[in-house]
From Swiss-Prot:
It comes from Autographa californica nuclear polyhedrosis virus (AcMNPV). Plays an essential role in nucleocapsid assembly. Essential for the establishment of efficient per os infection. Disulfide bonds join C208-C221, C261-C274. PANTHER family: CHITIN BINDING PERITROPHIN-A, CHITIN-BINDING TYPE-2 DOMAIN-CONTAINING PROTEIN-RELATED. Its main location: virion. It comes from the Viruses. This is Capsid-associated protein AC83. The lineage of its organism: Viruses, Viruses incertae sedis, Naldaviricetes, Lefavirales, Baculoviridae.
Length: 847
């Protein structure tokens, strides 16, 4: 008994296990799927196995649902599913042979194209040859939509009224596109429906009024015959819109004709008879009528029973109450009969383009397309200060619609256009110094992401200096000599023109030589600086580098001369802090040229100088004569001649020598050399000895550094760094810097003391300047500020920092060379052996 139960349970278990295994295998892998994948792999192998081995995984399109399709990837070893993914055929297409997805644009471009010879056809590129496909009748292929679309009803038709045939009724009234032959009834038209085509290709289906039939030959609605079976003289209650106030319609010989009342009578449409009265007498205010002596666009409107007003319209129509009224749009008045299209065109000095289109029908506006003409460069600022003086639109009209404006659909009338710079602190107008080229605009609107807009702007500029001109006419691009009362080029500031008040002729041409520069704030355009040698001149030939070189610095190492600020300051300091050994008194304030190099053009004669070593000692027993005629003279042994004591033709070296505390300036003359010995045999060449190091300069004041801050080729500021090569002066500088005197109102600007003659406007009408007053370095409040600035942080009126040696932080002001300035600690690491002096070349020279 137990054995039978066990056998039954075992049988049930086996049946369940077999069923589960079967279902698992069935759902996991059915025979149909196996067959499909086997066919897919077989097809793939046949077409590709000659080129490459069978891959481990193959994908194929397994399901399609409208635009969505599924790509199934399976293992080629056992045909089991590897992966599935969902895709959109509007975005990408699966390439079976290459086992890759390709963008739709590329597929369409490669596989589908329109047939230029027949708009009803399109061409498919097959694997072996092209295949021409046809759209249904009255359909054309639209490549943009990649499908066949109905031919517009007004295709190739001018504006006007057209009869409705069977095909038009099917498509426009019944809204059905049937693929059938309409040639059998091609001559039949609907009696009252007609097609109105507009100038822009649009259409409308309209119907004639009651008692009217559309005449296909004339293209107008004509009234039906109203006098059929009516006697002659029968007056009709039919009043066409062009019927005058004294006219009526009557029947004659079975046809309706216009009848007319006797003179001085009107036809009363209420009484249906001619009466002798004013047209307004029976109808009152608001009644309208027309007479033979007014125009086609005019009518009379009754003000009361005996007065009327003449109304002039753009277009006269009659409303549903049989009263005249005005209609139409004034914009259509220039079109013939108020019907047609007008393409608007924008033209200025630089470009021209179509900006829109107006379509009218019977003086009514059907379509008014206005493209977006807002300037794409309206808010564009190049290099933070330049604007294009050109109105380049956002959109243009291409004949059918507004499209984005490009270099291809905008016509350039000139090769150059004006460039404007935003207002600046110095009032510099650069529109005559450079012009933009049309290639710049083409590059800017092409949306080339490989270059930024500033780089494109700088690359396509035309400079006045390129044409060897002081300026270019912003409107014609031709060289000019005047543009207002003066003309200069900030990119080539070697010259300038001063013109008459009308700006028509040159009064004076300035060529700036050594010691002169262009001062844009001066009426004379000339500034003076003895050290300046056109150091700010731009040497670049690359146009892009020229405009990018807005702010730069020139450094020049030169000598301290007796006439410059270094000599004045250091001489004063030296004489103040130097004392005589015997009396410990301050040396007299006398400048004697002992501190600096002798100017090149000052001659020193031997009779007025004494050698330091020739000074007579106080304890000398005897005083030797300056010149002893009996002293043994050197002679020339070769010719037994006596050499002169002074030979003006003798070659000698002289050193201009000076020493602190000396009595005067001295020439130290090298003693005459003996005659050269007889030539000896040339010795063997020896290695060249190393050059001896240069001896240090014997001068206390030797070198100075000049730093010019340039705005393009115009110098704005000059920083002089005076080298101190004497311990007395170095100690004096340190003492002065440790004992700076500051006015109370200039406490915020106390750090101007690092650089003499530095100026800062601290607001509230207070201007502070650093100076050396002969006793101490002071930061003093000026009685009247030299300059007042709107922006205290930049010390300018346009928010641009021009003075690179003046620093502002948290309301405090400091003058310091850039390389010595510590912005984090607001500190100037000033050098103990240098004195700095700042010149504002543009502003201070005109104060």
């Amino acid at each position: 008994m137990m054995s039978g139960v066990m056998l039954l349970m075992l049988a049930i278990f086996l049946i369940i296990a077999f069923t589960l295994m079967y279902l698992a295998i069935y759902f996991e892998f059915d025979e149909t799927t196996f067959t499909k994948r086997l066919q897919v792999m077989t097809e793939y192998v046949k077409r590709t196995n000659a080129d490459e081995p069978t891959p481990d995984v193959i994908g194929y399109v397994s399901d399609i649902m409208q635009n969505t399709y599924i790509v199934t990837w399976f293992n080629t070893v056992d045909l089991s599913t590897y992966h599935e993914s969902v895709h959109d055929d509007r975005i990408e297409i699966f390439d079976f042979l290459n086992q890759k997805f390709q963008p739709v644009d590329r597929i369409v471009h490669d596989r589908v194209r329109a047939n230029d010879e027949n708009p009803n056809e399109f061409i498919l590129s097959g694997d072996k040859a092209d295949v021409t496909m046809k759209c249904p009748a009255y359909f054309n292929f639209d490549y943009a939509q990649l499908k066949c679309v109905p031919v517009p009803p007004c295709d190739n038709k001018s504006a006007g009224l057209y009869p409705m045939d069977e095909r038009l009724l099917d498509t426009l009234v019944l809204n059905q596109h049937l693929d059938k032959d309409y040639s059998t009834n091609a001559h039949l038209y609907h009696p009252t429906f007609y097609l109105r085509c507009f100038a822009n290709g649009a259409h409308a289906v309209e119907e004639c009024p009651d008692n009217y039939t559309f005449d296909a030959e004339t293209g107008q609605c004509k009234v039906n015959e109203l006098c059929e079976n009516r006697p002659d003289g029968y007056i009709l209650s039919y009043f066409p819109s062009n019927l005058l106030v004294n006219q009526f319609m009557q029947c004659v010989n079975g046809r309706h004709v216009v009848g007319e009342c006797p003179a001085n009578k009107i036809f009363d449409r209420n009484l249906m008879s001619c009466v002798e009265a004013h047209p307004c007498a029976f109808n009152g205010a608001g009644h309208t009528y027309i007479t033979a002596d007014i125009g086609d666009t005019q009518y009379f409107k009754c003000l009361n029973n005996n007065e009327s007003q003449l109304i002039t319209c753009i277009n006269r129509i009659r409303n549903s109450d049989n009263q005249y009224e005005c209609s139409g749009d004034s914009r259509c008045i220039d079109l013939p009969n108020g019907t047609g299209q007008h393409v608007f065109k924008h033209v200025d000095d630089d470009i021209s383009y179509n900006s829109g289109q107006l379509v009218c029908d019977n003086f009514e506006v059907i379509s008014d397309i206005e493209c977006d003409q807002s300037n794409v460069f309206e808010n564009a600022l190049f290099m933070d200060k330049f604007r294009l003086n050109m109105q380049f639109p956002t959109e243009v009209f291409d004949g059918t619609a507004c499209v984005p404006a490009t270099a291809d659909n905008v016509n350039f009338l000139r090769s150059t256009f004006a460039i404007e710079n935003i207002p600046n602190h110095y009032g510099i107008d650069m529109q005559t110094s450079m012009l933009g080229t049309t290639e710049m605009v083409k590059q800017l609107v092409s949306k080339d992401l490989s270059l930024n807009n500033d780089a494109i702007f700088a690359q396509w500029l035309l400079y006045a200096r390129d044409k060897d001109a002081i300026g270019l006419n912003p409107f014609t691009g031709e060289p000019i000599d005047c543009f207002g009362d003066n003309l200069y080029d900030v990119f080539d500031a070697r010259r300038a023109n001063i013109c008459n008040d009308s700006g028509t002729s040159v009064l004076k041409t300035l060529n700036f030589g050594d010691g002169e520069f262009l001062n844009v704030l001066s009426s004379t355009l000339t500034g003076k600086d003895e050290d300046y040698r056109q150091f700010c001149a731009i040497s670049y030939e690359n146009g892009q580098k020229i405009v990018e070189n807005e702010h730069f610095q020139r450094r020049i190492l030169t000598n301290i001369l007796q006439s410059d600020v270094c000599a004045d300051l250091y001489t004063t300091l030296y004489q103040k802090y130097t004392t005589l050994n015997s009396k410990y008194t301050t040396t007299p304030l006398q400048y004697n040229h002992t501190l600096v190099k002798r100017p090149k053009n000052i001659e020193i004669y031997g009779a007025n100088t004494r050698l330091k070593n020739a000074t007579i000692p106080k304890n000398a027993a005897t005083i030797p004569p300056v010149f002893n005629p009996f002293e043994n003279q050197p002679n020339n042994r070769q010719n037994d001649s006596i050499l002169p004591l002074f030979n003006p033709f003798q070659t000698t070296d002289a050193v201009w020598y000076s020493e602190p505390g000396g009595d005067d300036d001295h020439w130290v003359v090298a003693p005459p050399t003996a005659p050269p010995p007889p030539p000896e045999p040339e010795p063997e060449p020896e290695p060249e000895p190393e050059p001896e190091p240069e001896l240090p300069s014997p001068l206390i004041l030797d070198n100075k550094d000049l730093f010019y801050s340039c705005h393009y080729s115009v110098p704005f500021f000059k920083l002089t760094s005076c080298h101190a090569e004497n311990d007395v002066i170095i100690d004096a500088l340190n003492e002065l810097r440790n004992n700076v005197k500051v006015d109370a109102d200039c406490e915020l600007a106390k750090d101007l003391s690092h650089v003499l003659n530095a100026y800062a406007y601290v607001g509230n009408g207070i201007g502070c300047r650093s100076a050396y007053d002969g006793d101490a370095i002071v930061v003093k409040k000026e009685a009247v500020p030299s300059h007042v600035y709107a922006n205290l942080n930049t010390q300018s009126n346009d928010g641009v920092k021009y003075n690179r040696w003046l620093h502002v932080k948290n309301g405090q002001y400091m003058a310091c060379p850039e390389e010595l300035y510590d912005n984090n600690e607001f500190k100037c690491n000033i050098e103990s052996d240098k004195l700095y002096y700042l010149d504002n070349l543009q502003e201070d020279s005109i104060v």
